[in-house]
Amino acid sequence: MTLPASWNEICDLFDSYEENGANKLNKFMDDAEKKYSIGLRFLYNSPGLSITELFKKDVLFNANKLQLLTSYRKHIKRHFKNPRLISLLEFPVLFLGTSAESGPALYSLMSYSGIKQGTFYPMGGFAKVIDSMAEICKKNGVKFLLDEQVTKINVLNKKVESVSTKNQELATNFVVGAADYAHIESKLLDIKYQNYDSAYWESREFSPSALLFYIGVNKKLKNLEHHTLFFDEDMEKLSQEIYDTKVWPEKPLFYTCCPAKSQEDLAPDGKE
């Protein structure tokens, strides 16, 4: 299945797999767009410091539209019957640390963002975005310390006063921790300053890691697109193996990225 960039072509694709597929897709995406807008307006910009943030008037008024009590799989199957279309819409949820059966219908907002709004590729790769941000920061006086592993966040009187690294201790006015929450709490803070104990983190379902292969091919691969998802095995079984039985999948699904399809100079001539 080739997923085009054009929305009209995507609608034609859904029509080719299922009767009235385009109409069903538009209804599905209209609903997903509402979830996306609600999430962006009322949840995304909240600091996440207290559960009371969820009790705002606008959030409560729109709560039923988020479908938090309906599974994402059930929501998809209300719209579509074709197994390939179902797999296409279910796949992104695997990266959130859950399955379509367990995750709420709210997660349809991911399909809205990826399929309806579109997926974009910065020329030079995503590292170029980081490089550009770093350049802007440097022009504004920011100093970067690279290869500087943080080993501890030091707290005095309930206030962070410094950060220890393997090389030095740095006094701080404030700290922004962009690492994994569980890592910061359990590895960098003293126990008395942690919000959650080890038992809590052990009971959580984390988003999965990935096994990555970087492969160079000495010829052009005509049947690959920039992004290719292989749905030739049972996705429901895959989800059960990852999240329920917690074993290495017997027949894993996989994703292939071939960026030279969009930017030819990433590979030598005639190669991928």
Language model: regions and residue ranges:
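Helical element adjacent to the flavin cofactor pocket in flavoenzyme catalytic cores
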Residues: 77, 109-161, 166
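Rossmann-like flavin
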Residues: 3-102
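Alpha-helical scaffold segments in soluble metabolic enzymes
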Residues: 74-78, 132-135, 187, 214
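Mid-domain catalytic core of redox enzymes
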Residues: 151-269
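FAD-binding beta-loop-beta segment adjacent to the flavin cofactor pocket
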Residues: 98-106, 263-271
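General beta-strand structural signal in soluble alpha/beta enzymes
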Residues: 87-89, 146, 177
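Glycine- and acidic
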Residues: 58, 91-92, 113-121, 210
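Conserved active-site and cofactor/substrate-binding residues in soluble primary-metabolism enzymes
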Residues: 67, 71, 101, 124, ...
